[in-house]
From Swiss-Prot:
Compartments where located: Cytoplasm
Superkingdom of this protein's organism: Bacteria
Main location: cytoplasm
An annotated GO BP: defense response to virus
GO cellular component, one term: cytoplasm
Alphabetized UniProt keyword annotations: Antiviral defense, Cytoplasm, Restriction system
Physiological role: Component of antiviral defense system DISARM (defense island system associated with restriction-modification), composed of DrmE, DrmA, DrmB, DrmC and DrmMII. DISARM is probably a multi-gene restriction module, this subunit has an unknown function. Expression of DISARM in B.subtilis (strain BEST7003) confers resistance to phages Nf, phi29, phi105, phi3T, SPO1, SPR and SPP1. Protection is over 10(7)-fold against phi3T, 10(4)-10(5)-fold against Nf, phi29, phi105 and SPR, 100-fold against SPO1 and 10-fold against SPP1.
Protein name as catalogued: DISARM protein DrmE
Effect of disrupting the coding gene: When this gene is missing the DISARM system does not confer Nf, phi3T or SPO1 resistance in B.subtilis.
Length: 799
């Protein structure tokens, strides 16, 4: 076993452990051996509790032999662990060091390095028998807490070590650096001032991109369809990928042991009954030419704003499940959503349009796709989706449709409801469910259906629902460009050796024919084998690059000419950055006199003011940072998700009734609503506010729009909104202390709040930036998109 309570290795856990298979034990030994040899490891397995145990195993092996490989063998190993800080610290608190084994290791190290001055605290690692004898007053225990011997430190950029023994007596006897550093900051991998001997990154928790891996780094994944896995094949990593093929070959005698659910494990690493359908479109060549031109323009340093608009348009057209006309009707009802025609018009209105033949050709290709090939009126994917869904519903089957975005989900709901001649609300009566893929994972939703339907995939993330949803049959509708891209990603992984297989699977034929990625590859690659489509790795790379959209690119001095344009004022800050604000934009402003952050409208602020941005967005509420960091099962997260559900129901009915804020305001007033500001209706719908403050407002809105649950479950929604407002006030209190406390020290209550949200002050600091106003441009008004209000731009990012 790996560190069970009966294990007499150096470090073990003092609480009952999950049972590890023999194959996992052997694999773990090989992985740690590779780390000692300065190799990088990619480990993917659904058994998440292996990750912290590998940290212990690396420490154990380093103390027995690894120290001999270091330039300074007297130095103790330093291990960086990038993961959920609180969970890892809780695990380490249960770990113990076997005293008998420790003393043996001290003797071995002492013998290897030679003379050590007993009075020099740097050499405490070889004198633990003496130190512990005095600490425990001659009554040496069998086991000692891990951090007494191997100091543990946690932090984000600055690390604080745990106290070692009563009043840190043991810590004062040992002057070497901590052994285990626990953080959630991935940037520590590239920390120049500190060199770690081993690095463990929990990629199941840390979702950022990975690059420039130091030697002896282990990357842990629990999802076979993580997009970083094919990307990392470009680096020198050894793959240990545990899929269903591995788990099915575990010794039957081991499976009978307690605490093991083999079926649950297999579900996490297996895909079955998948049909990939090639959707032939008449505009495939235009898409291929578009991504080539876009790449050419970007390499030629063409307008960054215009190429970003073009990338958005390519992305939307490939993802669309319906005609662009109906999509635009839905998107135009939300103030922050781009429409297809709106983006196209931006390109046509560009000041750079006639300066570059490639750009002009690109505009013509977009027009051809919409009008010559009729994507404005119909969609080849939508036609096949509709036929399949209606047929399944006719047979009485339950259907789950997964979309990549809320926009496409809403558009497809409207499309299918019109085809079935019913309201969106009534679709659920036919066991027809619609989900956004990221919600299934982020909210830990459990879904069962007969038929799972998806209609776009330009990355592995789009396929992840296949591992989460319990289905009998899955259909995936894709264009040739999408099939080519996914096939190339799968091919990249299959070309690399999987070192985990030899520990689980002895039959070499079986190793190649039934693994997870091979199963998927065969279903995607069949179209190339049948010569229906051609595979092209260069085209796959271009598609991936071309559909990468930057979140905020400065438009410069040019006005936006769309019908949804808003008038805004340009603000220059002292560091050269800029932002746009409307007259009534609500912003956070630093009140230095009273040492607090206040909420003001833009027309109330002046040149001496300092504006607060959260993640480079003046409109973003700080509480969003808190709620993003907490587990889906937390009561605050549940309340937040309840508000999200309420908002989506409101959004859907607003769209279905082709409503606008003026009309809804009149209907609300007629129904007895006593509010006089119609802007709150939009704020509720867009998520700018956390819903109504009055219980009656929820009921009136439900009665006017015909949403029964707003009336029946009003107390549930009201309680959720009230709870989040209380939590938001707590976040604001912490914000004030964070900005105005020079020592940035919180009291016990505020520290407990941060701990519950799994945050540190350093993490909050990374999300916050304050900007001092240098100039408010008063001689000109700018016309911009509603979504551009309040965003922070670097001027040099304009072109």
């Amino acid at each position: 076993m790996l560190y069970s309570t009966s294990d007499k290795s150096l470090v073990h856990c003092s609480v009952p452990q999950q049972i590890f298979y023999r194959a996992e034990e052997c694999m773990g030994d090989e992985i740690v051996g590779s780390l000692l040899c300065k190799e990088n490891i990619l480990l993917c397995t659904p058994r998440k509790y292996i990750f912290p145990h590998l940290v212990l195993r690396a420490l154990n092996m380093d103390e027995t032999m690894g120290f001999q490989k270091r330039e300074n063998p007297s130095k103790r190993a330093e291990i960086l662990v990038v993961t959920n800080r609180l969970e890892m610290l809780a695990f380490l608190e249960t770990c113990r060091v076997n005293a008998e084994r420790l003393f043996q290791i001290c003797s071995n190290i002492h013998q290897y390095i030679g003379y050590c001055n007993m009075g020099d605290t740097y050499f405490a690692r070889v004198y633990w028998r003496h130190i512990l004898y005095h600490y425990y007053e001659g009554k040496l225990p069998q086991d000692v807490p891990l951090h007494y011997i191997y100091p543990v430190a946690s932090g984000y950029r600055k690390f604080n070590a745990l106290s070692r023994g009563n009043r840190n007596i043991l810590g004062r006897k040992d002057s070497q650096n901590p052994t285990i550093y626990v953080t959630e900051n991935l940037d520590m991998l590239n920390e120049q001032e500190h060199s770690f001997d081993y690095i463990f990154v929990d990629c199941s928790y840390i979702k950022k991109g990975l690059s420039n891996l130091p030697k002896s780094t282990l990357l842990f994944f629990d999802n076979l369809l993580d997009d970083r896995i094919p990307y990392l094949q470009k680096s020198a990593v050894k793959n240990y990928i545990v899929d269903g093929d591995c788990i099915q070959n575990i010794d039957e005698n081991e499976i009978q042991q307690p605490m093991i659910n083999i079926e649950e494990l297999l579900h996490k690493v297996s895909i079955h009954s998948l049909d990939v359908e090639y959707v032939k479109s008449s505009f495939e060549q235009e898409i291929e030419r578009l991504i080539h031109l876009l790449d050419k323009l970007r390499k030629g340093k063409f307008s960054r704003y215009d190429t970003n608009v073009a990338a958005k348009l390519v992305y939307i057209l490939i993802r669309l499940p319906i005609g662009a006309g109906l999509y635009d009707l839905i998107a135009s009802m939300q103030p922050y959503w781009d429409t297809v025609l709106g983006l196209l018009q931006e390109l046509k209105d560009s000041e750079s349009r006639y300066e570059n033949d490639s750009f002009e050709e690109m505009v013509s290709l977009f027009e051809d796709i919409l009008y010559k090939h009729s994507l404005d009126r119909s969609n080849p994917k939508g036609d096949e989706l509709k036929a399949f869904i209606l047929n399944e519903v006719k047979q009485g089957k339950s259907v789950c449709v997964v979309s990549n975005s809320r926009k496409n989900q809403l558009a497809l709901k409207e499309f299918i409801s019109l085809a079935m001649g019913m309201t969106i609300e009534e679709l659920a009566e036919y066991d027809l469910q619609f989900f956004v893929s990221k919600d299934i994972w982020a909210q830990d939703i459990t879904v069962h259906c007969d038929s799972l339907v998806m209609y776009s995939a330009i990355n592995f993330r789009d396929l992840q629902s296949l591992l989460k949803i319990s289905y009998k049959r899955a259909k995936l509708y894709l264009y040739s460009s999408e099939i080519n891209l996914i096939t190339q990603k799968l091919k990249t992984i299959l070309e690399a050796e999987n070192y985990a297989l030899r520990h689980f699977v002895q039959n070499s034929t079986q190793q190649d024919s039934t693994n997870f990625y091979r199963y998927l590859y065969n279903r995607f690659n069949k179209f190339a084998r049948q010569k229906v489509i051609g595979l092209n790795s260069a085209a796959a790379d271009l598609l991936e690059k071309s559909t990468t959209v930057s979140p905020a690119v400065y438009r410069g001095e040019k006005d936006y000419k769309g019908t949804d344009a808003v008038k805004a004022t340009l603000v220059h800050f002292t560091d050269g950055s800029v932002s746009f604000f409307t007259k009534n934009s609500a912003v956070y402003v630093l009140d230095n006199k009273n040492k607090r952050v206040t909420h003001k409208h833009f027309h109330e602020i002046g040149l001496k003011d300092t504006i607060l941005f959260v993640d480079n967005d003046a409109r973003k509420d700080l509480y969003r940072i808190f709620i993003q960091s907490v587990d889906a099962k937390d009561t605050s997260k549940q309340a937040y998700l309840s508000i999200k559900k309420w908002r989506e129901l409101y959004e859907e009915k607003f769209m279905e009734k082709r409503m606008d804020d003026d009309r809804l305001f009149r209907l609300m007033r007629t129904a007895g609503w006593n509010k006089t500001t119609k802007s709150v209706l939009r704020n509720w719908r867009t998520g700018y506010s956390y819903g109504p403050r009055d219980r009656e407002d929820i009921m009136v809105l439900g009665e006017v729009l015909g949403i029964n649950t707003f009336v029946e479950d009003v107390q549930t929604y009201y309680n959720a909104m009230s709870k989040i407002r209380v939590e938001r006030r707590k976040a604001s209190r912490i914000l004030n202390k964070l900005i105005y406390s020079s020592k940035q020290v919180l009291g016990n209550e505020d520290s407990a709040i941060l701990a519950r949200y799994n945050l540190t002050l350093e993490q909050l600091n990374e999300s916050l930036v304050t900007k001092s106003i240098k100039e408010i441009v008063s001689d000109r008004m700018y016309y911009i998109k509603p979504a551009e209000v309040g965003l922070l731009y670097n001027v040099d990012a304009k072109e």
